[in-house]
C-alpha cells in the first residue's frame, strides 16, 4: 500500500499485461497488451511529481536508446520506486525540469512513462526537442537487457510509428552516437545495431 492508499497489483507476461489499480473509492482500470501501445505504465501509477517542461516538436525524427546506469529492476513495484528515484535525481541533483527520458524500460518487460510523448527529455543536447529518448533501467556494458525488456522497447517504437509520433524515415541511434558517454552500454548497443532504422 503506497502513501496515497493505492494498491497496485501487476500481472505481467511477455505478451500480455493486466494492470489493476484499486483506489478508494474503488476504481478499476484494466490495460491489456493486445497492441503495441498498451503496455505503458502512466506517470500517475508511479506517482510522478508534477512538472511543466518544454514541449516536443512532433513528430520526432530520432529514437535515442539510452541506459540509466546504476541498478536495474525486475519486479513492477521495484521498477516504480526506481523511476521515482530517477526523477528525484534529475530534479533535485541535476536541476532538470523533470526525469530526463521520454520512456523507461524495466526488466519486468514493462514501459514506464517518463515525460511521455509530448514533453522534451534532457539527456541529448541538440536533440531533445526532436528525439524520443528510451532509457533501459540499469547498466548494460557487458550484459544486455533481457528479452522481455528488449521486446517492450521494440513494441514502444512500433507504437510511436502507429500513432504518428515518429516520422516514417526516422533514425535510431545509441546515446553514445551523439554524446560522449558509455550509454547505452556496449552489450545493448550491439543489439540495437540490428534494429530497423539504426544509423551509426
Language-model-derived ranges and their functions:
Residues 2-68, 106-122, 127-200:
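Basic/polar, cationic surfaces and motifs that engage anionic cell-wall
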Residues 37, 53, 73, 79-80, ...:
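Cysteine-centric signal of extracytoplasmic or virion-exposed proteins
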Residues 57-91:
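Active-site acidic/histidine clusters and adjacent loop/turn architecture
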Residues 86, 90-99, 107:
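Glycine-/small-residue-enriched capping loops at alpha/beta junctions
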